């Protein structure tokens, strides 16, 4: 269930069914079973006229823009209104408003061939918004863009969501898009949702192996650090999954682990205002497990030790 006004992300491996699921929302694909409801309305048995209205209310943008090369920016944006029979004066007024919203007023008479990738996607967004939809579907909308244009398009989508109260549903292979933009995320595998929740929860403590594989760098394991330990050394991993809201405090960590602690590596970032990641620390002398576990909550959300396989698997 996707709430009105939220930004909802869908991730999964290639072939998981992400694009098919997205296209079910506006009935570009037909469901073999089950039901999809939009604002409480079942859409499975819609007539042609009802489908036209549905696709006006549920707009879509694509990875490859799909602009008409022989029409200007303004003409591309105007096209859905023209096809719907909207009067010319009303069309022009609406196009002017939308071009101003997406920052393309100065390029209204430009041809698609003269636009950058980011400008083309902004045109696609404007064309989708011109019918005043309630929901915007984004099918890999930033995959063809460079990092700078990706950031600009994500910022625009966030502004549109906040200003218009628009519900946005997106699919992507880019975890940074989910981190930056989404309120909640679902993980799809073989056409089934295997995990979903707030972004910080799913990224901070993924419960499924597929999710951990997709997140990759946030939940890696480096066996070579274990192999490099001498007989008397100990490896401590501090996990931050966002559940307590605390941040790494080096002073507290040093107080708990002692002066003979060395930071091997760490990876932490903020997602929805919560710190997600881990720190791995080598101790010159091992500390008693009960002592560390008793005080673990003082410095991290979880703590695991080298060789503590059961604890590490439970926390993975």
Question: Which residues does each predicted region cover?
Answer:
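ABC ATPase NBD coupling module
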Residues: 43-59, 83, 88, 202-206
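ABC ATPase "signature
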Residues: 196-197, 205
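A short, proline-enriched helix->beta-strand linker immediately N-terminal to the Walker B motif
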Residues: 130-134
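Helix-to-loop junction immediately C-terminal to a conserved catalytic motif
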Residues: 26
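Conserved ABC ATPase "signature" region
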Residues: 41-42, 78, 82, 89-106
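Conserved ABC ATPase signature
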Residues: 111-115, 119-121
């Amino acid at each position: 269930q996707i709430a009105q006004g939220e930004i909802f992300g869908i991730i999964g491996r290639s072939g998981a069914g992400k694009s098919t699921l997205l296209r079910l929302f506006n009935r570009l694909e037909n469901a073999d079973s089950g039901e999809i409801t939009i604002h409480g309305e079942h859409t499975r048995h819609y007539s042609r006229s009802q489908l036209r209205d549905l696709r006006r209310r549920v707009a879509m943008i694509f990875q490859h823009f799909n602009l008409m090369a022989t029409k200007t920016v303004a003409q591309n944006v105007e096209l859905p209104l023209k096809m719907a029979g909207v009067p010319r004066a009303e069309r022009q007024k609406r196009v002017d408003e939308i071009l101003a919203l997406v920052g393309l007023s100065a390029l209204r008479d430009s041809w698609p061939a003269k636009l950058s990738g980011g400008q083309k996607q902004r045109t696609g967004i404007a064309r989708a918004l011109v019918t005043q939809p309630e929901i915007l579907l984004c099918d890999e909308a930033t995959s063809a863009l460079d990092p700078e244009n990706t950031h600009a398009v994500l910022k625009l989508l966030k502004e549109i969501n906040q200003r218009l109260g628009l519900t946005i549903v997106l699919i992507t292979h880019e975890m940074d898009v989910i981190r930056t933009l989404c309120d909640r995320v679902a993980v799809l595998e073989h056409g089934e949702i295997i995990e979903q929740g707030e972004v910080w929860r799913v990224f901070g403590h993924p419960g499924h192996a597929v999710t951990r594989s997709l997140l990759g760098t946030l939940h890696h394991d480096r066996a070579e650090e274990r192999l490099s330990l001498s007989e008397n050394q100990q490896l401590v991993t501090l996990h931050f999954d966002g559940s307590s809201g605390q941040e790494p405090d080096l002073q507290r960590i040093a107080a708990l682990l002692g002066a003979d602690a060395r930071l091997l590596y760490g990876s932490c970032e903020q997602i929805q205002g919560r710190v997600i990641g881990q720190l791995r620390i080598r101790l010159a002398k091992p500390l008693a497990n009960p002592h560390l576990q008793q005080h673990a909550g003082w410095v991290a959300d979880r703590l695991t030790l080298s060789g503590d396989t059961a604890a590490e698997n439970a926390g993975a």
